[in-house]
């Protein structure tokens, strides 16, 4: 898994940007993975393990009505966790994990239902702030496998956003440079 964390940190460091992590089902595994990379302190601000529902609400600012209506395993909850930890720890990027590692279903969701989210300085095509990205996963395996795959998935989602933004910028520069000749 560490290569994903190393790639994320390399891109963040190059960009001079920072990361905060909010975790539920992964219980600190994402933060541990990031912190295991030498030089992580250049970009990693910290994390909140919001395992209990009231911590998601009271610390990360997830809407109480959303939690009451949908439960903690929900794409909007993941999005609000990522936005909340980003705001709380004053980071450029926030990532979050919430889901059901098992062995029992939770909030009406089957084991292996996981939502990972990224919140960051996105821009839409019109240059407006673009909010957050959430990925819905249906994972197989035991509790440990589901948690480890959730770590890989949230880091991959962030890496995709970081690399995508960089690629987009490079393409735009190429187009300008070669435009009209």
Predicted regions and their residues:
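Short alpha-helical segments enriched in small residues
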Residues: 1-181
């Amino acid at each position: 898994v560490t290569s994903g964390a190393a790639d994320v940190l390399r891109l963040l460091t190059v960009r001079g940007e920072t990361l905060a992590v909010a975790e539920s089902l992964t219980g600190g595994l994402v933060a541990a993975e990031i912190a295991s990379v030498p030089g992580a302190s250049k970009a990693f601000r910290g994390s909140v393990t919001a395992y209990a529902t009231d911590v998601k609400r009271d610390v990360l600012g997830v809407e109480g009505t959303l939690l009451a209506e949908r439960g903690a395993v929900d794409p909007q909850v993941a999005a609000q966790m990522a936005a909340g930890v980003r705001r709380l720890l004053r980071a450029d990027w926030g990532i979050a994990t919430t889901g059901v590692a098992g062995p029992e279903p939770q909030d009406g969701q089957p084991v292996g239902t996981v939502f990972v989210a990224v919140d960051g300085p996105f821009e839409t095509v019109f240059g407006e702030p673009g909010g957050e990205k959430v990925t819905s996963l249906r994972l197989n395996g035991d509790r440990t496998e589901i948690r480890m795959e959730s770590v890989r998935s949230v880091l991959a989602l962030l890496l995709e956003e970081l690399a995508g933004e960089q690629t987009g910028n490079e393409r735009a520069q190429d187009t300008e440079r070669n435009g009209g000749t």
